[in-house]
Amino acid sequence: MRKIIVGSRSSKLAMTQTKWVIEQLKQAGAPYEFEIKNIITKGDRILDVTLSKVGGKGLFVKEIEQQMIDEDIDFAVHSMKDLPSELPTGLIIGATPSRVDARDALITTTGGGLDSLPEGAIVGTSSLRRGSQLLKLRPDLKIESIRGNIDTRLEKLKTGPFDGILLAAAGLQRMGWSEDIVSEYISTDDMIPAVGQGILAIECRANDQEVRDLLNLIHDQMTEKVAFAERSFLAAIEGSCHVPVGGFATINEDLSTTLVGFLGSVDGQQILLERETSLDPMQLGQTVATRLLDAGGREILASLPDDL
C-alpha cells in the first residue's frame, strides 16, 4: 500500500488544516497511510516586511510546490487565499472541501467592535484589501502592517501599539479560538473577502490519478464553482498582494453563481464594486473584472505606489 506524503507549512494553523484533511480522507474510507512533511517557506522566514514587498502570494507555496513537482510530496493543503491565480505547470487543485466562514474578524484589546474603537485607533493588518475597506468604513483609523502567524499576531496585539487586528475568521475557527477572542465579524457586505478566503485548496500533480481519485472523496463541487469564479476574477485583475482586491461568490437556488468584485485605493477613498450573476463561473469572473477595470480600476491600479 502506497504511503501518501502530505506537505504542510509548520505553523499551527497549517498543521491543523492538514491534519483535518487527512482525518476527513480517513473517514471517507481512504485506505492509505499518511505522513506529514513540514516545509519552511520564504513567507515563514521573512516576517519583518510586508508581503507585497517580498513577492506576494507565492511566498507561502513555492517551496511546497517545488517538492510536489520533484515528487517528494504527493499533495499539499493550502489556504486558497494564499495561492496565486496561476499554478505551476503540472500542478492542479485536486480538491476543494466545503467552504467555511469567509468573513474577516476584528479582535480588539477591549473586546468591543468596530464602532467602539476610538478616533485614530491603530488597527493591524498585512492586507491592503482589508486596510482599504476598513478606511472606507472608518476613515479616522490608522492602519499598521502586522505579519506573522495567528499566535504571533495575537501576541503583538497584547504587547504592541495596536488597538485591534483583522484576521480571517476561518483560521480562527479552525483553531477553535473564535468564540473566545473575536470582537466582531465584519459582514461580507461591508468587507469583501479575499479571493478563496475560507476555502482549503488541496494541490497535487495533474498526472497522479491515484491521488486525484483519493482527493475526490472530500471534494465539494459548489465550493469549486465559487472558487473558479473568484480565481478567474483575480487572474483577470492580475491581482496580488500589491493590490487592494477582493472577490466573493455565492451559489443561487438555480445553481447560477453571483460574484461581487472589489477594487480600491489603499486609502479607501476610491472603492469600486461590481456584481453579476452567471451560469458560467469562469466567464463570470472575467466579466466582473472587466467591468471593474472599465469603471476606473485601471486608474486605481496605475496609481498604486510601487513600494507597497
From Swiss-Prot:
SUPFAM superfamilies tied to this protein: Periplasmic binding protein-like II, Porphobilinogen deaminase (hydroxymethylbilane synthase), C-terminal domain
Keyword presence, Manganese: no
Domain of life: Bacteria
Modified residues annotated as S-(dipyrrolylmethanemethyl)cysteine in this record: 241
Keywords of this entry: Porphyrin biosynthesis, Transferase
The protein's role, per its UniProt record: Tetrapolymerization of the monopyrrole PBG into the hydroxymethylbilane pre-uroporphyrinogen in several discrete steps.
Protein name, per record: Porphobilinogen deaminase
The organism of origin for this protein: Exiguobacterium sibiricum (strain DSM 17290 / CCUG 55495 / CIP 109462 / JCM 13490 / 255-15)
